[in-house]
Amino acid sequence: MGIRPPPGERSPAAVLSFGVVNLDKPPGPSAHQVSAWIRDLVGVEKAAHAGTLDPKVTGCLPVLTGTATRIAPALLEGFKEYVAVLELHDDPPRILPDVIEAFTGEIYQKPPKKSAVARRLRTRTVYDLDVLDVDGRQVLLRIRCESGTYIRKLCHDIGRALGTNAHMGHLRRSATTPFDDTDLVTLHDLADAVAWLRDTDDTEPPDAPADALRAAVQPAERALTHLPRLTIADSAAHEVATGAPVYAPGVIDTTALPTPPADGALVACYTAGGTAVCLGRLVGDPDADAGVVVALERVLV
């Protein structure tokens, strides 16, 4: 089984078949709907979004295309960042800063009634909660939190703690590990890039349509940049492609691993050229002479 070329050497078709779109989701359609639109637009069999957004919510929604959908579990590792409008039902009291600070750190949440998960009390971590602006009864918040935090419920609970009651107004996701809103792509951007590539002729600069596509669809390796990484030999990569784990003799570079690496950590393995080969759990010493180092979870080639 062949190993795909390094990210910078792939054809447009190869990028589409193993790519990621950092989509600026518009209000209205569901996350599932925009994923289906992207699937049909780029002409792949499947596409998957990472971290759902409600129809009214806008912002950062990574969409994986083709075989890159195998990467989806890796995007559960990390944080989310939102900008939300807290709509108070009365004038903001003086205790607003103190109440906001009290909701930083570990909090308790019960999923809302319409949630797809069991409504059991659980803990989530709010890493940062900042007031960006106050305009009358509207409070603009920036929230950096653990995946799975319900922002609508957070706004409701803040309102109760303030004694004014409150609900969530507009919500926009500004980041989801490892993506943020600095390089978002709209559906129109993507459609234009795909159309340009398909309709190009000899009068066009030879690389311009492909460059436009690569600006809209990034190699899927972009979705793994937050994970610890191991570099493995090409011979080991070919063995992984057939389902074998990563053995110690096949590891050629560990400099991108944390020191000391945590047992059971999710890691990404690459060739020396930068092609993602697999995701797996670190189960052995990568500096050892023998033994299994990475137990496979997803083969990416």
From Swiss-Prot:
Lineage top rank: taxon: Archaea
Domain PUA per the UniProt entry, residue ranges: 227-301
Keyword Protein biosynthesis: no
Substrates-to-products reaction catalysed: uridine(55) in tRNA = pseudouridine(55) in tRNA
Active-site positions on this chain: D54 (nucleophile)
An annotated GO BP: snRNA pseudouridine synthesis
Keywords, alphabetical: Isomerase, tRNA processing
EC number, as in UniProt: 5.4.99.25
Gene Ontology MF terms: pseudouridine synthase activity; RNA binding; tRNA pseudouridine(55) synthase activity
Pfam families: TruB_C_2 (PF16198), TruB_N (PF01509)
Top EC class for this record: isomerase
Coiled-coil regions listed in the entry: none
Sequence similarity: Belongs to the pseudouridine synthase TruB family. Type 2 subfamily.
Function: Could be responsible for synthesis of pseudouridine from uracil-55 in the psi GC loop of transfer RNAs.
PANTHER family: CENTROMERE/MICROTUBULE BINDING PROTEIN CBF5, H_ACA RIBONUCLEOPROTEIN COMPLEX SUBUNIT DKC1
Record protein name field: Probable tRNA pseudouridine synthase B
UniProt lineage: Archaea, Methanobacteriati, Methanobacteriota, Stenosarchaea group, Halobacteria
